Structures are given as C-alpha cells and as structure tokens.
C-alpha cells in the first residue's frame, strides 16, 4: 500500500537483473508496478512478473518513464488491474535506451482509463533515439469507462490540465475531470502505438485482445478531420502518457509511425456511439490484421489508413463490407 502522496509508486524496480515479482496486491497513488532505468550504462533485464493485482491512480504496469539504459527480456503473466486512472499497460522508450523483447500475457483490466500505450519518443533531446521493438501482448480484456476511473479514492491522479508539483491539486479532481469537460476538450482516448517520423515502433504483436470502451465520442467535444491528421501533434520530447496528444481520430486503436504490427483476434467495441473510426493508422508499414472484430461501428470508415504501405486484412468483421469499411488515402496500398 503506497497512498500517502500523489507521486507514490507501488513497486519500483530500477536498473536490476534477474528479478521475480509474484502474488502481490498493490494499491498506489502513482504507478503500480514500474520498471525504470536511470543509468545509461545499466538496464532492467530478465524480470518475471506473475499473478499480481494492482489498483493505481496512474498506470498499472509501466516500463519507464526513465529509460536511459532500457529494458530487455521482461515477462508479465496474469496481471489484474482495477480502478486505474491511466493505462493498464504502458511501455515507454523516451530516454535513448532499448525497450526490446517484452512478453505480456493474461491481463484483466477493469475500470481503467486506457488499455495499451506504446510510445517511442525523444525526451533526451540531443541524445540518441531509443528503440521499441519485439513486443508481444496477448490475452487481454479491458473495460474503459467514460468517467475518471479512480474517482473517490483519498488521493486521485492529477488532472491532465494541471502540472503536478507546481499547481495546487484539487481535493476531488473527479468533480470536474470528466471527458468532454472544458478543461479536457477531447473524447475518450483510444489505445495507441506511436513512434516518431523515421523512428517507428517495430515488431509488435497484439493477440487475443478485447477492449470495451464507454464510447460517446462527439464532434461537438473535439474533432480531428481525417484529411488533416497532421493536427495530431508529434510531441516528440513531451512526457509520455496515453493522453499526451489530446484528441485522437479513433476510438479503439491509433497507430502512428509503426512497422511490423500484427493484430490477431482483436475485438473492439463501445457502449455508446462514437463518430470516429475504430482504428486509424498514419505512417504504418508492413503490418497485418487478422480476425479484427469491430461489431459496434456505426459510421464509415471503420478503419482509416493514411500514408501506409503493405497493410493486409484477413477476416475483418464489422457491420459494413470490407470495401466500405476500410478507407485508404494518399499512397496507401493493400
């Protein structure tokens, strides 16, 4: 239990090798289980995490934010998360280190702000860009609500429009921290895999994953036209967080600057209608999507591809025929 201060992680492992974390219950006001790498000459490596339950006012399982040396050979099994403000799974490579050979299977995330967030960024301006590749995430079930997931806990996660450590934190952020509130002018945020121009996220498998969103996205709250995806900021050096880009032009999954992505048996659904595509890809290459199920789509396109190459779909299930459901623009080819 680590709940005395808003910045308290549950369990931090820093620049360590050959570690096992099993059968723990963690309640934290910041990240639940968090691996960090503060030393460019060291690394978190050969770490096994199994059969843990996490409640977090930040992210449930996270690699980062500090990733100077990096992370390699990290295995996660049978993770349950609930009432988690940010992401169930957050893998962040932003400080020049490696993030490679990550294997995550068996995640149940209930009442969590986001399911999956992968980010290759460049916070260490002037230094090398780190790697983010060879990631396997499978057997995941996640429920994403419309309202702040950790509302009512003694110390809630800080609202995105305030700067922790500088701005005064309200006693009850959830009193105003609702999607669509003027302080947060964006709709419910999708899972995302986002790299940088010329530095893509590489070789990621998302398999046997089911994410059910609250939905409710409306143009009156925020709208990024599909013909103007450049309005989504790169935020190259910003602190990595699933909400770092603000409004995104998808309700289920957003992929940008990525290569070698494989979706296998992924189901995306919402409870309330959302006007955005379920999946939007921008600068994605050499990727395949098999048995992608989107049963609740209401508007076209269901999947939108911009500046993509060598993208294939097998067994796409939606209420619309494939020829209508998938829209490709610019140099997109099948």
Located regions from the model:
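Extracellular/periplasmic carbohydrate-active domains that bind, remodel
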Residues: 1-334
């Amino acid at each position: 239990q680590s709940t005395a201060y808003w910045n308290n992680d549950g369990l931090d492992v820093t620049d360590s090798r050959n570690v096992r974390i099993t059968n723990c219950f963690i309640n934290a006001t910041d990240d639940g289980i968090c691996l960090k790498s503060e030393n460019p000459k060291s690394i978190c490596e050969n770490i096994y995490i199994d059969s843990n339950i996490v409640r977090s006012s930040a992210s449930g399982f996270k690699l980062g934010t500090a990733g100077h040396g990096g992370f390699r050979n990290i295995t996660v099994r049978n993770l349950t998360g609930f009432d988690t403000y940010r992401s169930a799974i957050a893998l962040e490579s932003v400080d020049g280190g490696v993030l490679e050979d990550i294997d995550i299977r068996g995640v149940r995330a209930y009442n969590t702000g986001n399911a999956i967030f992968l980010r290759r960024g460049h916070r260490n301006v002037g230094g090398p860009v780190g790697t983010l590749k060879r990631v396997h995430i499978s057997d995941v079930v996640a429920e994403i609500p419309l309202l702040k997931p950790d509302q009512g806990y003694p110390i809630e996660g800080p609202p995105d429009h305030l700067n922790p450590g500088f701005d005064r934190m309200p006693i009850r952020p959830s009193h105003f921290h609702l999607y669509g509130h003027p302080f947060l002018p964006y709709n419910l945020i999708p899972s995302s895999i986002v790299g940088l121009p010329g530095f893509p996220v590489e070789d990621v498998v998302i398999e046997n994953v089911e994410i059910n969103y609250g939905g409710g996205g409306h143009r009156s709250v925020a709208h990024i036209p599909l013909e103007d995806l450049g309005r989504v900021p790169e935020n190259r050096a910003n602190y990595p967080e699933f909400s770092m880009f603000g409004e995104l032009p998808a309700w289920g999954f957003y992929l940008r600057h990525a290569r070698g992505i494989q979706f296998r048996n992924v189901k995306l659904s919402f409870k309330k209608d959302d006007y955005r595509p379920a999946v939007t890809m921008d600068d994605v290459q050499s990727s395949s999507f098999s048995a992608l199920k989107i049963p609740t789509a209401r508007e076209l396109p269901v999947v939108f591809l911009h500046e993509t190459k060598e993208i294939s779909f097998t067994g796409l299930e939606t209420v619309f025929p494939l020829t209508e459901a998938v829209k490709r623009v610019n140099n997109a080819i099948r």
